From Swiss-Prot:
PANTHER family: TBCC DOMAIN-CONTAINING PROTEIN 1. This is TBCC domain-containing protein 1. Pfam families: TBCC. The keyword Cytoplasm applies. One of its GO terms (biological process) is regulation of cell migration. GO terms for cellular component: cytoplasm; spindle pole centrosome. Keywords: Cytoplasm, Cytoskeleton.
Length: 557
């Protein structure tokens, strides 16, 4: 088969979920990663290759790269969360951790974890995606970019937004521009010069090409099936092009790189393709007096399970509520949604909320990462594997999470609070995403960026300000209470408030008011309640629950 009919593309998930949205440690440069690659490959008997154990990575990261132990674990755990584990395996790991009585016991359990060594090296290298380039900053927009100055178009085909994690053009360009470095990182130390470079005669092992399948996949001709890179590279008709030798069982570095470059193309399941030719969803309605129309698109009708995307933008002044197969297992991006109440009550793969204001987001369990960037006055309610935030102001996070929330750069007035709601299918959805109620680190965030070393950037919600959140929709299912319950201090605050209400009701009852007095009192209470609804913004939420006119009803997902 003609090699021009082979199409390769860069996978989205390693970048959407795996690339931490913060400049990487300086020790993750190619120079140090090459040294690590050589170090681990010559220590195969010491838990370093082909599987890298946590204890070995901890030794390398803390002892040689001078990283803090928490940061070393963070990168190790993020990569591990990308691995193909069943929900049952993830729940089993949560149970193991929840039974640990000390940090020493936790560390003992972590020491049993291992990851694919070569893939982990690639994972560390792609952290360079979010490296700050001084040259780009000088010739492009100011960095940091003034938030109120941003007038970038909303989710256009070639989005110029700064979120490279969702930009498949950035993914493709990154791999194409650094392909030689990526291949050299995977070479056997014997194939490198003294300065850690390849030669024209360098050979690439099958294991290295298997590892590169972490980033690249593809298809042949018009076949609908997707293949990992190594299966295509090892396919008999392509040996001459990919440079594979049956005798040495290796690839020619030069031929392999040339073949990869000639076949790399855009991701047919990426954000750009989704926005250009994806299915448009009529989930939102047009609000009177606004010119911008909500844009919601998905590729779930054509994409395989791990490639599903849902992108929504410009939902404005309304309630949008969905529990849909379209959302199940999808990577979701929510962009420029303002003054809205958005409920996505399905098990989700990942969620990114970007440039949203004055809104509430209630999400089904998020199996990997929930990330917020450049949001103001937003409340997020979710069970998620990981929460990370950057450039947020005045946001509140009611979360249940087995990992420490990550506070990245540029945040102000962050509030964390316990998860405080439920819907009938919640526990079923948690089981499907492998999320348990313990351990729960909602109140122990990790400040990742040095500028935020001052812990005052966040606070825990005072119990006196805590209320449970009621999801105002009927669904089938068995969950009838908040999974895992509430922390005792918050449960106590609710009990005290309920007691005050009962005392007040008793006082009114024993006042023996006349009929006219009762009527006057009722009007007074209703007026005060109405004022409270307006002052708190709850009036808008109640109004938005009223279904729109028949002609603009939200479509079923």
């Amino acid at each position: 088969m003609d090699q021009s009919r082979v199409l390769l593309w860069v996978k989205a998930e390693p970048f959407i979920v795996g690339a931490l949205q913060v400049p990487p440690p300086s020790k993750f440069s190619l120079h140090y990663l090459r040294k690590i690659s050589t170090y681990v490959q010559i220590r195969a008997t010491e838990g370093a290759y082909p599987r890298l154990y946590w204890s070995t990575w901890r030794h390398i990261a803390c002892g040689k790269l001078q990283l803090a132990k928490d940061l070393a674990w963070l990168y190790f755990e993020i990569f591990d969360s990308l691995s193909m584990k069943t929900p049952e395996e993830r729940l089993e790991w949560s149970e193991v951790l929840s039974n640990c009585m000390s940090e020493e016991e936790v560390e003992k359990q972590r020491n049993q974890l291992s990851v694919d060594t070569l893939q982990f090296l690639l994972f560390l290298y792609i952290q360079q995606l979010n490296k700050v380039s001084l040259r780009t900053s000088l010739i492009g927009e100011e960095w940091p970019s003034p938030r109120n100055k941003s007038q970038s178009p909303d989710l256009t085909e070639k989005s110029n937004c700064h979120n490279k994690n969702w930009n498949d053009y950035s993914h493709q360009a990154f791999v194409y521009d650094h392909l030689s470095d990526l291949l050299e990182l995977l070479l056997d130390p014997k194939q490198l010069t003294a300065s850690f470079h390849s030669t024209h005669s360098s050979l690439v092992s099958r294991e290295a090409v298997v590892a590169l399948s972490f980033l690249i996949e593809g298809t042949i001709s018009r076949a609908r099936k997707i293949y990992p890179l190594h299966e295509l590279a090892l396919w008999q008709p392509l040996h001459a092009d990919s440079g594979f030798s049956k005798i040495s069982k290796t690839f020619s570095f030069y031929k392999l790189e040339t073949w990869l470059r000639s076949c790399l193309t855009g991701n047919p399941f990426g954000t750009s393709a989704c926005l250009k030719s994806g299915k448009k969803l009529a989930w939102a309605h047009q609000v009177e007096g606004t010119t911008k129309r909500a844009k919601i698109a998905c590729n779930t009708h054509v994409a395989p399970r791990m490639h599903r995307l849902v992108v929504m933008s410009q939902v404005y002044k309304q309630t949008l509520a969905k529990s849909s197969d379209t959302l199940a297992g999808a990577h979701v991006k929510i962009h420029r949604c303002n003054e809205s109440f958005i409920y996505l009550l399905s098990p989700l793969r990942s969620v990114t909320i970007e440039k949203c204001r004055n809104s509430i987001f209630v999400l089904g369990p998020v199996g990997t990462t929930l990330h917020l960037h450049s949001c103001d006055n937003v409340k997020v309610i979710a069970v998620c594997h990981r929460l990370s935030i950057s450039s947020t102001t005045g946001c509140i996070f009611h979360v249940l999470t087995p990992t420490r929330p990550l506070i990245l750069s540029g945040n102000q007035t962050v509030t964390f609070a316990p998860f405080h709601t439920h819907y009938p299918m919640l526990e079923d959805h948690m089981a499907r995403t492998g999320l348990a109620t313990v351990p729960n680190y909602w109140d122990n965030p990790m400040v990742v960026c040095r500028e935020n070393s001052d812990t005052r950037v966040f606070q825990l919600l005072p119990p006196c300000e805590f209320y449970v959140f009621i999801i105002p929709f009927e669904m089938e299912g068995d969950t009838t209470e908040i999974p895992g319950g509430l922390p005792s201090v918050y449960q106590k605050a609710l009990g005290q408030r309920e007691q005050k209400i009962q005392i007040w009701q008793k006082t009114v009852k024993e006042a023996h008011l006349t009929k006219d007095q009762r009527k006057q009192f009722q009007v007074l209470v209703e007026n005060k309640f109405y004022e409270w609804l307006i002052n708190t913004g709850h009036r808008q939420q109640l109004d938005s629950l009223v279904p729109p006119a028949a002609g603009s009803k939200q479509a079923a997902g």
